[in-house]
Amino acid sequence: MSQDFGKLIRQARKNKSYSQRELAKILKIDFTYLSKLENNRADYAPKEDIIRGLARNLDLDEEELIYLAGRIPHQEEELLKQHYKSMPALFRRMRENPEFAEKVLQQASNTEEK
């Protein structure tokens, strides 16, 4: 999990004036697990439904939070499965050629804005 994930949900929880116990009860999770998430000490990333619950209750962007947690949203996961043979080559090329990576990411951002 990204270190930013824990900091983000902790700060958002405090901004909403929730205690860990209150938010955990809303999410139907143990407050000790929420504490581990906030401190980046959880043994595994939370499930997508928990992340979406955090986002809804803390007024955070669901997709961003899913990525920060180290997960891939279900719809993107399906796309990756459909094109699984192309992914290693794409990621390798992006790693080896930062300009190409920037171009791909910029084009993706421009497409989302339209």
Q: Residue locations for each model-derived region?
A:
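Intrinsically disordered, low-complexity basic tails/linkers immediately adjacent to helix-turn-helix/homeobox/MYB/SANT
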Residues: 56-62, 93-95
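DNA major-groove recognition helix of helix-turn-helix
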Residues: 38, 46, 69
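Short, basic-rich loop-to-helix N-cap that marks the start of a DNA-contacting helix
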Residues: 17, 25, 41-56
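Interfacial/linker helices and their anchor residues that mediate assembly or domain coupling
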Residues: 70-114
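DNA-binding alpha-helical recognition surfaces that contact promoter or target DNA
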Residues: 7, 11, 25, 36, ...
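A short, Lys/Arg-rich alpha-helix, primarily the initiator
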Residues: 1-15, 107
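Short alpha-helical DNA-recognition segment
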Residues: 17-37
